[in-house]
């Protein structure tokens, strides 16, 4: 551990004992990590304090960057709400603000889930990230249907293709305008476009791209700036930004857009990672590359799978996960947050893609590759909201 970038958490622990449940929680909260540095089975499962009994993550990093969590509206009550208020000072909607959630049919808006998240963030003085205005997935098909009811991508007539392009851009602009005007006083950073780079190189051949070329990216940012104002912070968000080839493709795109005057404020690094991948060196290189363009960096969807890719051989229950594997995860979280602190001047936010291990999209991936049975455990709080070894490593 490099102590230069770490600070004691005694003060935060004292506060947590006062607000986290009273005298009855003192013994649990003072338990801390085992002196050996490795959790035994019973110690791992039952002897660690609950998330609401320990020092706050957001207070620990308040001088460096925001600590956020992705949420669904139903998680804003009970224990999960208690954990959110204690550990996080930033929120993002996991699904409730995606295009298919907000405008499933043209002109028909569904604000209920998104509004609930906005109101929770406002009530508890939290920062709010918006995810996402434009994406190739979870976008309703009506965006890409022409006025005759045909798929725009199938059109071959040049004049009709141009008309379809303008219609799609108009629909996108209207969607962005409506959303940004509604939430601009609450949202502090916007994922304007998401996952536009293809893993195989170049731009993703989405319907957006096939119909408009790169114009949809440019117009999306310009529209968000127009209706959000200069104070709106606008991000281009993607996964695997640590992969050199994909990083370079994203860098070249962003550099070109900036040279055209497109208002981009930063890059969102999703950071869906694994214990053994990517390297800290590649992670550092990605942040530094976009910092060189004068851009902010945000870690937007952090989770750390126990497995490689694909996640074959997944454990079938939480109790089957070896203590040594959770310790390896803790070591990697430690290295990662050490890097984040070192580069804190260039990283404004670190958001986990969930609250605790009992709700993660990675469980679906584990089941997909293991005959319908499998779980993952990517966060610093376990499936019962107890702290994991990773928590103790990043709170010190």
UniProtKB/Swiss-Prot annotation:
**Which is one Gene Ontology cellular component term of this protein?**
extracellular region
- Which GO biological-process labels does this protein carry? xylan catabolic process
Show the SUPFAM superfamilies listed in the entry: (Trans)glycosidases (SSF51445)
The protein's location, in the record's own words, is: Secreted
Q: Which EC class is this protein assigned?
A: hydrolase
**For this UniProt entry, what is the primary localization, expressed as one broad class?**
secreted
Database matches in InterPro entries:
GH10, GH10_AS, GH10_dom, Glycoside_hydrolase_SF
Q: What is its EC number?
A: 3.2.1.8
From the UniProt record, give the pathway where this protein acts. Glycan degradation; xylan degradation
Q: Which region is the signal sequence? A: 1-28
- Which Pfam families is this protein grouped with? Glyco_hydro_10
| UniProt-annotated catalytic positions | 195, 301
Q: Which UniProt keywords apply?
A: Carbohydrate metabolism, Glycosidase, Hydrolase, Polysaccharide degradation, Secreted, Signal, Xylan degradation
Gene giving rise to this polypeptide: xynA
Summarize the pH-dependence annotation from the UniProt entry.
Active over a very broad pH range.
SMART domains annotated for this entry? Glyco_10
Tell me the organism's taxonomic lineage.
Answer: Bacteria, Bacillati, Bacillota, Bacilli, Bacillales
Protein name in UniProt: Endo-1,4-beta-xylanase A
Please write the reaction equations for the catalytic activity of this protein. Answer: Endohydrolysis of (1->4)-beta-D-xylosidic linkages in xylans
UniProt organism field: Halalkalibacterium halodurans (strain ATCC BAA-125 / DSM 18197 / FERM 7344 / JCM 9153 / C-125) (Bacillus halodurans)
Q: Name one GO molecular function term.
A: endo-1,4-beta-xylanase activity
Assigned protein family: Belongs to the glycosyl hydrolase 10 (cellulase F) family.
Top-rank taxon: Bacteria
């Amino acid at each position: 551990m490099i102590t230069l970038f770490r600070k004691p958490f005694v003060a935060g622990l004292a506060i947590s004992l006062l607000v986290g449940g009273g005298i009855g929680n003192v013994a649990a909260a003072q338990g801390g990590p085992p002196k050996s540095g490795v959790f035994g089975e019973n110690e791992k499962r039952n002897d660690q304090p609950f998330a609401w009994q320990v020092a706050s993550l957001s207070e620990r990093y308040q001088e460096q960057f925001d600590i956020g969590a992705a949420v669904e509206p139903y998680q804003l009550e009970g224990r999960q709400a208690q954990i959110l208020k204690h550990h996080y000072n930033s929120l993002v909607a996991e699904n409730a603000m995606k295009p298919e959630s907000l405008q499933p049919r043209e002109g028909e808006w569904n604000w209920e889930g998104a509004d609930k998240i906005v109101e929770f963030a406002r009530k508890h003085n939290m920062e709010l990230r918006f995810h996402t205005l434009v994406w190739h997935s979870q976008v309703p098909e009506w965006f890409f249907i022409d006025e005759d009811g045909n798929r725009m991508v199938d059109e071959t007539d040049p004049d009709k293709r141009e008309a379809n392009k303008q219609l799609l851009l108009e629909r996108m602009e209207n969607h962005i305008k409506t959303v940004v005007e509604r939430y601009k006083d609450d949202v502090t950073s916007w994922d304007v476009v998401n996952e536009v780079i293809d893993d195989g190189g170049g731009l993703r051949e989405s319907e957006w791209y096939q119909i408009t070329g790169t114009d949809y990216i440019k117009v999306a940012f310009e529209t968000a700036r127009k209706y959000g104002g200069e104070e709106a912070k606008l991000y281009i968000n993607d996964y695997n930004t640590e992969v050199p080839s994909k990083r370079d493709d994203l860098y070249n795109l962003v550099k070109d857009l900036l040279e055209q005057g497109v208002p981009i404020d930063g890059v969102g690094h999703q950071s869906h990672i694994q214990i053994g991948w990517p390297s800290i060196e590649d992670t550092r290189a990605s942040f530094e590359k976009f910092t060189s363009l004068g851009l902010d960096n945000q870690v937007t969807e952090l989770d750390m799978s126990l497995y490689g890719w694909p996640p074959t051989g997944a454990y079938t229950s939480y109790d089957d996960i070896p203590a040594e594997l959770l310790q390896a995860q803790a070591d990697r979280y430690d290295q990662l947050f050490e890097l984040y602190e070192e580069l804190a001047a260039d990283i404004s936010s670190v958001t986990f893609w969930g609250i605790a291990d009992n709700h993660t999209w990675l469980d679906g991936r584990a089941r997909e590759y293991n005959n319908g049975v499998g779980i993952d455990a990517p966060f610093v709080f376990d499936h019962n909201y107890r702290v994991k070894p990773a928590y103790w490593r990043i709170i010190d």
